[in-house]
Amino acid sequence: MKYSIFSFFSGAGFLDLGFELNGYDIVFVNEFNKSFLNVYKHSRKVLQLKQPQFGYHEGSIECLLKNEKDFLSKLVAQKKIEQDIVGFIGGPPCPDFSVGGKNRGIEGENGKLSNTYIELICQEKPSFFLFENVKGLWKTKKHRLFYDDMKKKLHKNGYVTTERLINSLEYGVPQHRERIILIGFHEDLLTRLSYKLDEDLPDIPSDMFPWEKYTKYTKEEILSSSFPTTNDFNEESSYPCPNGVLKDLTVEYWFQQNDVSNHPNAEQYFVPRQGLMKFKSIEEGDDSKKSYKRLHRWRYSPTAAYGNNEVHLHPYKARRLSVAEALAIQSLPKTFELPTDISLTDAFRTVGNGVPYLASKGIAATIKHFLEQ
């Protein structure tokens, strides 16, 4: 089978990379932010990945639903004529559904983009789609109504769906990051593949879609691991990983694996104008506050969200995390880099916004297994 992926809200391309390295072909990339799109182009060049067949579209997804509708429709139609399985993947900006964000829901500018993405899927009818967003969209009562309405719209347009609240830790990412993943397959594709589904059930039965096949750890294994809590902050200190810890889920394991000290983005971090003593007063592993969370070297990171004044401190250095360290926490390959001329604000925003690479890779493998089993 040939898989052609149209990527939306692409950012730095973490989600796309997980699909691409699983044998999917990224043919179209849409991103509104010019700086983020430059990161995407730079990383592809460094990783020596071929350019998307239909190139890059810099602009709002809303244009593709309105005045540029024919442009996108022709591209999708071309891949369908070639008998490709066409996939739409994307994670619309999510502050409006986040408890830590603005929580405006569908009324917020970012919230509206989720609805626009669903409308685009219904308009173009790809073979399958992936929708990624924050837990709040699925868990919060007032947002859940909007989420359920989106699903109903998709079901009416011929999609059969499956969903799961994932934690990136399950896929081997050193980061506690919960996200709702909604995946849908058009009934035409499932008929073509001889899937027999109950016409009255718009959801794929839980025992049919292998959500856990490509996870690395169960939630129970993660909870039973003896991760340390806090230690005194000792600058430039070193000590081995304690027994009973899932080492490959720890910050220090990934710092070492990605050789973050020698990474091209190693020297990119915010330097405070004042308050250095505060950087030294917070215990290693104390991530209890809204801001100034100090990571523990032998534990996983809290969610890599570096906006809204959220400051994450290095476990054993008196400074904030570097871009290289943030990339490691997002489980990117050590060869993945950002252009060094990007602003620090944009660098941390695009890294924090991304879907962790290993989670993306696992989900991409799961979809492929479902379609090819």
Show where each model-derived region lies.
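Core alpha/beta nucleotide-donor-binding catalytic domains of modification enzymes
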Residues: 2-125, 135-148
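Short, solvent-exposed loop/turn segments at secondary-structure junctions
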Residues: 13, 34, 93-95, 135-136, ...
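Short, conserved catalytic/metal-binding motifs centered on acidic residues
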Residues: 88, 182, 352
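Redox-cofactor binding/interface segments in oxidoreductases and associated redox assembly factors
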Residues: 90, 131, 306
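C-terminal target-recognition/interaction regions appended to catalytic cores
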Residues: 240-373
